[in-house]
Design a protein with these regions (language model features):
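HDAC/HDAC-like amidohydrolase catalytic core signature
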Residues: 1-119
Length: 119
């Protein structure tokens, strides 16, 4: 993924900047997302797939799972934190603590399938 790829740390800063510029930040609450457990992730993805992904993370450098999906040593921690954000948001909505939720997360994972990592 090059410097012009839309998936970058700057994406989250841009989202935050737009929320502030629109005056919406005063209506938001921010929560630290926990790391999802393998058991939690395995409720949406086959456990074998999750374990294969965890094993595919390189100790150094970058490994491409497909042309659009690169992983580095910190990728799984980021993915588990993203999943944890969604789980926490769901728990907070279901408990009635908040009415709705939006998770600005990295990596987004919006192309992923249940048993296949994609973009």
């Amino acid at each position: 993924m090059g410097a012009h790829h839309p998936e970058s740390p700057e994406r989250l800063a841009a989202i935050n900047d737009r929320l502030i510029a629109a005056g919406l930040d005063m209506y938001l609450s921010f929560h630290d997302a926990p790391l999802a457990t393998v058991d939690q992730v395995a409720r949406a993805h086959p456990r074998e797939h999750v374990e294969e992904l965890l094993a595919s993370v390189p100790e150094h450098g970058i490994r491409h799972l497909d042309p659009d999906t690169a992983v580095c040593p910190s990728s799984m921690k980021a993915a588990l934190r993203s999943a944890g954000a969604g789980i926490l948001a769901t728990d907070l909505v279901m408990s009635g603590e908040i009415e709705n939720a939006f998770c600005a997360i990295r990596p987004p994972g919006h192309h992923a399938e249940a048993a296949k990592a994609m973009g």
